[in-house]
């Protein structure tokens, strides 16, 4: 009975933590502006196109600060193309004798 209760409590905790994580990811990007419709006045269409342009600029902008996260720093170190790290063949070195 005690083990069954622990199992259900751990499943409930896992489900709640997953819901919290999904809620966090949902707010990552701004929401797309609502289309006022085909027969909307010119001012509403101008506001919509301005909001849409702002939305597209936010979504497609370059994020310069994202490269400094620890994961990307490690991948840069591991996958960096550096001539010193590339192994050379013995035939490129001058003969020793």
UniProtKB/Swiss-Prot annotation:
GO terms for biological process: feeding behavior; neuropeptide signaling pathway. One of its GO terms (cellular component) is neuronal dense core vesicle. Coiled coil: none annotated. GO terms for molecular function: neuropeptide hormone activity; neuropeptide Y receptor binding. The modification Tyrosine amide is found at residue 64. The keyword Disulfide bond does not apply. It is found in: Secreted; Cytoplasmic vesicle, Secretory vesicle, Neuronal dense core vesicle. Keywords: Amidation, Cleavage on pair of basic residues, Cytoplasmic vesicle, Neuropeptide, Secreted, Signal. The keyword Signal applies. Its main location: secreted. It holds the Pfam family Hormone_3. Residues 1-28 form the signal peptide. InterPro entries: Pancreatic_hormone-like (IPR001955), Pancreatic_hormone-like_CS (IPR020392). Belongs to the NPY family. NPY is implicated in the control of feeding and in secretion of gonadotrophin-release hormone. This is Pro-neuropeptide Y. It comes from Xenopus laevis.
């Amino acid at each position: 009975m005690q083990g069954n209760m622990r199992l259900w409590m751990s499943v409930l905790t896992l489900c709640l933590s997953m819901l919290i994580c999904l809620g966090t990811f949902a707010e990552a990007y701004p929401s797309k502006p609502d289309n006022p419709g085909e027969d909307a006045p010119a001012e509403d269409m101008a506001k919509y196109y301005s909001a849409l342009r702002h939305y597209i600029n936010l979504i497609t902008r370059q994020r310069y600060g994202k490269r400094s996260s620890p994961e990307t720093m490690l991948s840069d170190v591991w996958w960096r193309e550096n001539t010193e790290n590339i192994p050379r063949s013995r035939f490129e070195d001058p003969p020793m004798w």
